[in-house]
C-alpha cells in the first residue's frame, strides 16, 4: 500500500509541475508556447540512466565509467532544461514571469523524476522494473 501512496504523491507532484509549465505558456499575458520544448528534456532525462542500468552488470561497484557518463549526460540534459527558458527570456521571446513559472515547473518535474527513481528503483516487489 505504501507503493501506491508514493505513486499517487508522485503523480500529483508531476501534475503540479506540468501546471506551472502550462501557466507559463497559456496565461493571457504570456501567450507564447515556446517553453513547451522543455518537455523534450523531461522525456529524455531518464534515458542515460536506463542505458547505464542495462549495460552495467556490477551494481555493487562504487564507481563505473558507464554510470558516471550517464550522470554526466543527465546533468547536461537537466541544465539545458533550466537554461532554455532563461535564454528565451533573455532574447525577449518570452517574458520573465513565464520564465519563472517554467523554471518552477522544471524544478517540480525533475524532483518528481528523481523521487520516482529513489522510490521505485530499489528492485523490491513494487518496483518500476516490473511494469
Swiss-Prot record:
Keywords assigned by UniProt, alphabetized = Endosome, Golgi apparatus, Membrane, Transmembrane, Transmembrane helix
Compartments where located: Golgi apparatus membrane; Endosome membrane
Cellular component GO terms, alphabetically? endosome; endosome membrane; Golgi apparatus; Golgi membrane
Could you list the residue ranges that cross the membrane? 7-27, 32-52, 69-89, 100-120
| Tissue specificity as recorded in UniProt | Expressed at the highest levels in heart and placenta and at a lesser extent in lung, liver, skeletal muscle, kidney and pancreas.
Record-linked Pfam families: Vps55
What InterPro entries has UniProt attached to this entry?
Vps55/LEPROT
Q: Which GO terms describe its biological process?
A: late endosome to vacuole transport via multivesicular body sorting pathway; negative regulation of growth hormone receptor signaling pathway; negative regulation of protein localization to cell surface; negative regulation of receptor signaling pathway via JAK-STAT; positive regulation of protein targeting to mitochondrion
Lineage: superkingdom: Eukaryota
Q: Does the keyword Membrane apply?
A: yes
Q: How does it sit in the membrane?
A: Multi-pass membrane protein
UniProt GO molecular function: signaling receptor binding
Q: What does this protein do?
A: Negatively regulates leptin receptor (LEPR) cell surface expression, and thus decreases response to leptin. Negatively regulates growth hormone (GH) receptor cell surface expression in liver. May play a role in liver resistance to GH during periods of reduced nutrient availability.
Which family is this sequence assigned to?
A: Belongs to the OB-RGRP/VPS55 family.
The subunit field of the Swiss-Prot or TrEMBL record says: Interacts with LEPR. Interacts with RAB13.
Q: Under which name does UniProt file this protein?
A: Leptin receptor gene-related protein
Gene this protein is translated from: LEPROT
Amino acid at each position: 500500500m505504501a507503493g501506491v501512496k508514493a505513486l499517487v504523491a508522485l503523480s500529483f507532484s508531476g501534475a503540479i509541475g506540468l501546471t506551472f509549465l502550462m501557466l507559463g505558456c497559456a496565461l493571457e499575458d504570456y501567450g507564447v508556447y515556446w517553453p513547451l520544448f522543455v518537455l523534450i528534456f523531461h522525456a529524455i532525462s531518464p534515458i542515460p540512466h536506463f542505458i547505464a542500468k542495462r549495460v552495467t552488470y556490477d551494481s555493487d561497484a562504487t564507481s563505473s565509467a558507464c554510470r558516471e557518463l550517464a550522470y554526466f549526460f543527465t546533468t547536461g540534459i537537466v541544465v539545458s532544461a533550466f537554461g532554455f527558458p532563461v535564454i528565451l527570456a533573455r532574447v525577449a521571446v518570452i517574458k520573465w514571469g513565464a520564465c519563472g513559472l517554467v523554471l518552477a515547473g522544471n524544478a517540480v518535474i525533475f524532483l518528481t523524476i528523481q523521487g520516482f527513481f529513489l522510490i521505485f528503483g530499489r528492485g523490491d516487489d513494487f518496483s518500476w522494473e516490473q511494469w
